[in-house]
Regions:
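Generic beta-sheet signal
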Residues: 6, 96-105
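Short, surface-exposed amphipathic charged segments that create phosphate/polyanion-binding patches used
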Residues: 88-94
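Active-site-proximal alpha-helix that buttresses catalytic centers in soluble enzyme cores
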Residues: 2-86, 110-111, 116-117, 122-124, ...
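Domain-level recognition of soluble alpha/beta enzyme cores
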Residues: 118-154
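A structure-centric signal for secondary-structure junctions around beta-strands
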Residues: 3-4, 98, 133, 152
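Short, solvent-exposed aromatic-acidic interface loops
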Residues: 153-162
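Glycine-rich phosphate-binding loop signature in dinucleotide/nucleotide-binding domains
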Residues: 45-48, 94-98
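A short beta-strand-loop-alpha-helix capping motif that often carries His-Thr
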Residues: 104-109, 139
């Protein structure tokens, strides 16, 4: 039986206002709506989120707000443009008492992390094919968060809120 649940959420659809740096781009109306739907799905189908690890970009912070997930959040600059290895290093530093962790980040780091942790099976094929904005991958973790540096997890669900 898994001891922990990892939820990977790609930020909502962003807007592209003139003169706004990439890091500061806000969510588009669709992104706001779908981030709310993502939060609804997470609350309905997953254990309560104990902690959140979120990129510092405006669109990830706004995605977390729109999701209405109420849990202590840690914001990490390293998640902005992060590789799967960098995302895994951030996850590994999570408090061992956390049983359900939500990570809000970007492409390619979020889908690549899901695939690095569980590269086989039908869910991995779907994720490799397409991981759009506001998509969610959930994984069962049998060891500690630190174990994810060199141990796999098992993909349990992949959801695209629309």
């Amino acid at each position: 039986m898994p001891s922990k649940v990892l939820i990977l959420l790609r930020h909502g659809k962003s807007a592209y206002p003139d003169g706004v740096a990439d890091h500061e781009r806000p969510l588009a109306p669709r992104g706001q709506r779908e981030a709310g739907m993502a939060g609804d799905w997470i609350r309905l189908t997953q254990p309560p989120v104990d902690a959140v690890l979120c990129s510092t970009s405006a669109r990830t912070r706004l995605t977390l707000t729109a999701s209405r997930i109420d849990a202590p959040a840690r914001y990490a600059d390293t998640l902005y443009g992060a590789s799967a290895a960098e995302v895994r290093r951030e996850i590994a530093s999570t408090d061992p008492a956390v049983r359900t962790l939500l990570v809000v980040g970007h492409e390619p780091g979020i889908p690549d992390t899901a695939l690095a942790l569980d590269p086989g099976g039908p869910l991995a094929e779907r994720i490799a094919d397409r991981f759009p904005t506001s998509a969610i991958a959930t994984l069962a973790v049998t060891g500690s968060w630190a174990d994810l540096l060199d141990s796999p997890a098992r993909l349990t669900d992949f959801h695209i809120p629309r």
